Each structure stands twice: as structure tokens, then as C-alpha cells.
Amino acid sequence: EQPGEIAIMIRYQDKASVFRGVIPLGVPVEGTPAESNFIDKFIFAKLKKVGMPPSEVSDDSTFLRRVTLDIVGRLPTVREAELFLKNNSTNKRAALVDRLISTEEYAEFFANKWSSLLRNKRSNGAQLRTTMAFYDWIKESFYKNKPYDKFVREILAASGDMKQSPPTAWFKQVNTQQAQMEDASQLFLGTRLQCAQCHHHPYEKWSQSDYYRFMAFFSRVGKANAGRPGEDMVFHRAGIAQVTNKKTNKPVKPAGLGSKELVISAVDDPRHLLVDWMKTDENRLFSKTLVNRYWKHFFGRGLVDPEDDFRSTNPATHPKLLNALADYFE
């Protein structure tokens, strides 16, 4: 027997159930550090359960290096190290974090990460203006601490040209209804719907109906030439939002995953209703996916791993902690 923890799936015909099996290391866990926040409470409880003593509290030099790398993507300067190591304040570590996340370097570092997630790239010289405008918008969003739901809404429901709305660049790279639906679901809800296009997975909950109804949120996106090479105007085309379910060959209207079809007027942009649903859905995938993505950034592995693959057969290692993080974020 090897100590550790693993998720085990049991299946019978078209039914499946998952539980996490644990073989404790068996070492007594005593004298854990003082809890700094609710996260420590969950982690220390898990360490005691599996019999794994916590690591020693890092020294100041190690803490400074790790935090600076994780928040602004570089090593601390000599001057920063001198000031931090000389500081005898009891809250200097929290103050360091607060200082770093208020810098332009922080905004630049995470703008690079989100540019990659949002496929913000240029395939030719004509797209340079668009690419840079979208990057600058992402950076400014982080620098001004824009609310996350507003950040997502301004991307998914972007309208206008590059000057009016830089996130319209997303529709340049993700340029089909299918790609927009699949990217939005995987990036913002941690849910991979690609397989549901062709069949209902025997062990997962999303069906072809879910796939096409979710796609219908993007069915009224229109694009036109903005007058410059490589730039488009994105707009809402008035009309009934619907797509054809290729399995039934019948039209379906927009619906959140596992939800009923929505009644949307011809003049309303369904993309706004998509973000409204994301924020309020009882599954809370919108919040859980983001906090899990940041957990992976800071700790190397998500509570759900891969970080964009939330499903019943891929459970979180710490489900209560994931819920608590989502609570705190909301």
C-alpha cells in the first residue's frame, strides 16, 4: 500500500459514481502554525486527516522571492530585499502583497497570462493594432481592479470596433459560433463541451441539447469590415436567437447549462443574458473556475485538475475549500 489520495470512479451501464479514497501517511500532526485565514483552517484539517505534517514557515528571503515571482513575474531587486529584510513590522508580509498587486507590473504580468487564455495574438502584421489594443484593455482592467463579471461581460458581449471596444478582438480570433461557445464554456465555466457536439457522454451530464442551446447565445453576433485591414466591427443582429440542433434538426433557443430555454426579444442581445446566467447559476461554476485557476497559478496544481475540466468524474481534492473560496470571491 502506498499512502496518498485518489479519486475512484465506479460505473455500471450508463451510471457512474465517484469517491475519493485515502490511505493516510500516518504521521502525527501536531503544532501546526497559527491560522492566518480560512484557507489555513481547511488545509490544516486535511493534513491532519492524511497524517502529513505541514512544511516549515518560510523565512523572509524565501517569502519575498516567491511572492514577487508569483505576483509580478520577476525576482525582487536588491533594494526591495534590503528594505523587506530590515523591516521588523509584524504585518510586513501582507503589506508586501498589497504593494505588489497595486503596481503596474502586476497588471502587465497577469495581462500576459490572460492574453494567452483569450487567444489574443496576431497572425499577421495587419492585426497588430487590434492585438495591442486588447492587451492594453486587459492590463488596464487589472490595474483598476475591474469586477470580474464586468470583465467577462465586456468580452463576451463586446460590440463596436477596436477603438470603441477593444475586446471585440476576441471575436476576431474566436470567429465561429461553435468556437465562441466552446471557449466561453471552458474558460469561464471550466466545462469542456466539445464531446457533447456529437453525443451525450455516458458518464457526464451535458447533452447535445445543452451544447446547441448554449451555442444559441452567440447566434446573433454580426461582423463587418471596420475600414482597416485586420479589424472588424462586431454588433448584435436583431432577430430571434436560435440555432439548429444537428441531432434533431430542430431549432433551439439559448439556455444555460442544465437550464430552461430563455425567452429573449429580437432586440435584446442574448450574450448579456448569458453573463447574467453565469453569475447566478446554482452550480457556481463561474466563481469556482476562477478561484481554481488562481489556485493553480499560486500552488502549481488546481483543486480541480486540469483547471478547466470541472465534471462529476473529476472531483476537487478539497471540495469544501473550493466552495469556501468561491464564497469569499463572491
Features from the language model and the residues they span:
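Short, structured secondary-structure elements
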Residues: 2-12, 16-260, 267-275, 280-330
